[in-house]
């Protein structure tokens, strides 16, 4: 009887751990997602890269995106 209860508790623990791990994996932001308000929420191997936006010389705020770590975008020369 004790073995059945112990086995049931172990199975319940394993299922709970698998569920928690699955929830944690889904909590991060994928590549290309906006991360302006939460810089630390990008998925593994992604970083939150920000730039300032200007329209006609007037600053319009900051935008941040989840991009691969080490990748840099630059403005194309016209």
UniProtKB/Swiss-Prot annotation:
The keyword Chloroplast belongs to this UniProt entry's keyword annotation: no
Organism: Lycosa singoriensis
Subcellular location: Secreted
UniProt name for this protein: U7-lycotoxin-Ls1g
Keyword line: Disulfide bond, Secreted, Signal, Toxin
Tissue specificity field: Expressed by the venom gland.
Record-stated family: Belongs to the neurotoxin 19 (CSTX) family. 07 (U7-Lctx) subfamily.
One of the record's GO molecular function terms: toxin activity
UniProt PTM: Contains 4 disulfide bonds.
Taxonomic path: Eukaryota, Metazoa, Ecdysozoa, Arthropoda, Chelicerata
Keyword Phosphoprotein applies: no
């Amino acid at each position: 009887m004790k073995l059945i209860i112990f086995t049931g508790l172990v199975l319940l623990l394993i299922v709970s751990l698998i569920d928690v791990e699955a929830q944690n994996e889904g909590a991060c932001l994928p590549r290309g997602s906006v991360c302006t308000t939460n810089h630390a929420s990008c998925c593994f191997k992604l970083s939150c890269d920000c730039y300032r936006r200007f329209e006609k010389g007037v600053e319009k705020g900051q935008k941040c995106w989840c991009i691969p770590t080490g990748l840099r975008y630059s403005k194309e020369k016209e």
